[in-house]
Amino acid sequence: MPNYYLADDTKYTRPSTSAMSNLTELCGLKGLADSMARFDPVTGEKNKLRKSYKNQLLDLTGKFDIPSQPSLVRIIRDPVLAETGGKSLSVFDRDLLSRGLDFDATPSTGIPGFNPAMLGMPGPGKPGIGPQVGGNRLLSVRRSYNTESARESSNNEETPMARRKRKGDDDTDGERRRKRK
């Protein structure tokens, strides 16, 4: 059996404070809260937080002054960035940038060297992959064939059902499978 040791005989009581308690009064901050209240409880007028109130806040922990503009100094002084320094940065060639960031209109002949068929996009005058919408079904993709060779090859292909009918084996309802069992 393991030995248990009692470290202290002190009995602890539950604190009497709860989330429903007025913590401002319990901590002795009611006077400070009243002096800095947004509305005056007697007149109901708005009190502006003046610069003179900042002196009363100096003793409290935390930041009370909001910076006017976001600062990048914290990001620049980041120790992770300090290790890499400027090693990962390099200077771009201006000619390369001007060629890569050309915002001229696309010529009417299309982009030289770009094959829209590689992306399944319709070429000039040819349908490609497009959306097929029907009823409550989800958007599906279908391939439309526009060439005569594709139509001929699809008409010449015989389905397994057509092959069976041509051979006289008209077992469409699974009679052969039932006989085997």
From Swiss-Prot:
Residues 120-181 are annotated as: Disordered. Residues 122-133 have a biased composition (Gly residues). Residues 143-158 have a biased composition (Polar residues). It comes from the Eukaryota. Keywords: Activator, Nucleus, Transcription, Transcription regulation. GO terms for cellular component: core mediator complex; mediator complex. InterPro entries: Mediator_Med19_fun (IPR013942). One of its GO terms (molecular function) is transcription coregulator activity. The keyword Nucleus applies. One of its GO terms (biological process) is regulation of transcription by RNA polymerase II. Pfam families: Rox3. It is found in: Nucleus. Component of the Mediator complex, a coactivator involved in the regulated transcription of nearly all RNA polymerase II-dependent genes. Mediator functions as a bridge to convey information from gene-specific regulatory proteins to the basal RNA polymerase II transcription machinery. Mediator is recruited to promoters by direct interactions with regulatory proteins and serves as a scaffold for the assembly of a functional preinitiation complex with RNA polymerase II and the general transcription factors. Component of the Mediator complex. Belongs to the Mediator complex subunit 19 family. This is Mediator of RNA polymerase II transcription subunit 19. It comes from Yarrowia lipolytica (strain CLIB 122 / E 150).
